[in-house]
Each structure stands twice: as C-alpha cells, then as structure tokens.
C-alpha cells in the first residue's frame, strides 16, 4: 500500500513535485522577486544582485547554463533600476550611515557594514563624510551606544572597578576609540552627555 500524504487522505489533489510546480525563470519572475525585495528593504545594487542570484541558485540548483542565463537577466534588471534611480547606492549608503549613528554604531562599524552590503568605497566614504565632523558623529554614536546598553551615565547600578573595565571593553568591541569611550563614561548623567555633545559641535 502506497503512503498517502495528508492532502491526499483528505481528498485533495496530491502535492506536485517541486520541479513541476516551479515557474520558469524569466524576466518577469526576476523582476517580481526584485520588486518584492525592494518593497520590504532598502538595498544597494550589489546586495539586490546577490539576493536575486541566491534565489536563482535555490530554484535551479546545479543547472549551470540556466543560472548563467538568469544572471544575464539579473544584470540587465539591475542596470535598468540604476538608470531609473530605483537603486541609488549613494542615497542607500547615506541613509544607512545616519541610522547607524542613531543606533550607536561606530563609524568603523558603519563603513564595514556598507562594504558588506556591496556599497562601493567612494559611496561609503561619502556617506560617512556626510555625517559631518567625524569626531562629533562618533561621539553621538558612542552616546547612543551607551544609552542602548545602559553604560556610563545610563547605568542602573553603582559602578565597580571591574564593571568600568567591562564597559570600556564593550565600547572597544563596538569599534569606538578609547578616548571617546572614556569621555562618555566620565559623564555623571544625561545632562553631562548633552553638554559633552554640545561642546563637540
């Protein structure tokens, strides 16, 4: 007796094999994937290319000829989206850099994140430079990091010597310079943080 799936036992048609159910990869399907991704996420051109190539490889497996044909379609689509302005690496990098500072990421970590997303070195450097004076942006990011992690003036409990070393280590792991970390940790309260930030302008 052949095993029946729950769908077949319920009287519903059986499940089709994945190969039969999969639509052929053509320009319309790749564009649908790209638009669905861009509706949900901001993306650089290289990141969108990687996302689409992963989907193609997942769908086609080891069919090298079909994968190459799909890559050509992806390249054409990315070039068209860049020309139309739908993909703008400079704007993507600038927005991601601003959000990074607001979330407490160091400028080094922001630059590394942009490189990981496929943003070119020129666009990444311009985005970091657009944040203004590097020291002020780094200090603002360090203050946001301290607030998110409850360090320095945002800590809940009195500080022991071992805790101070641990807090300095947290700043170092996040990519902040020691003098910036010490300046933030030296603040007694949020008013001191505001004074520190206004003094850096």
Describe the residue ranges of each PLM region.
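An alpha-helical, amphipathic repeat domain used for nucleic-acid recognition
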Residues: 1-201
């Amino acid at each position: 007796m052949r095993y029946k799936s729950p769908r077949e036992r319920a009287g519903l048609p059986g499940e089709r094999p994945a190969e039969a159910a999969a639509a052929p990869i053509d320009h319309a399907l790749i564009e649908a994937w790209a638009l669905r991704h861009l509706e949900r996420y901001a993306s650089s051109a290289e990141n969108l290319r990687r996302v689409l190539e992963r989907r193609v490889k997942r769908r086609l497996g080891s069919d090298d000829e079909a994968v190459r044909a799909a890559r050509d379609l992806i390249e054409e689509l990315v070039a068209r989206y860049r020309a139309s302005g739908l993909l703008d690496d400079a704007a993507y990098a600038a927005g991601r850099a601003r959000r990074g500072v607001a979330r407490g990421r160091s400028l080094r970590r922001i630059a590394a994140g942009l490189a990981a997303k496929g943003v070119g070195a020129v666009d990444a450097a311009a985005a970091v430079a657009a944040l203004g004076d590097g020291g002020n942006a780094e200090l603002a990011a360090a203050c946001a990091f301290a607030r998110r992690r409850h360090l320095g003036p945002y800590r809940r409990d009195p500080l022991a010597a071992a805790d101070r070393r641990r807090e300095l280590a947290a700043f170092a792991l996040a990519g902040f310079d020691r003098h910036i970390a010490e300046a933030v940790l030296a603040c007694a309260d949020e008013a001191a943080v505001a004074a520190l930030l206004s003094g850096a302008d």
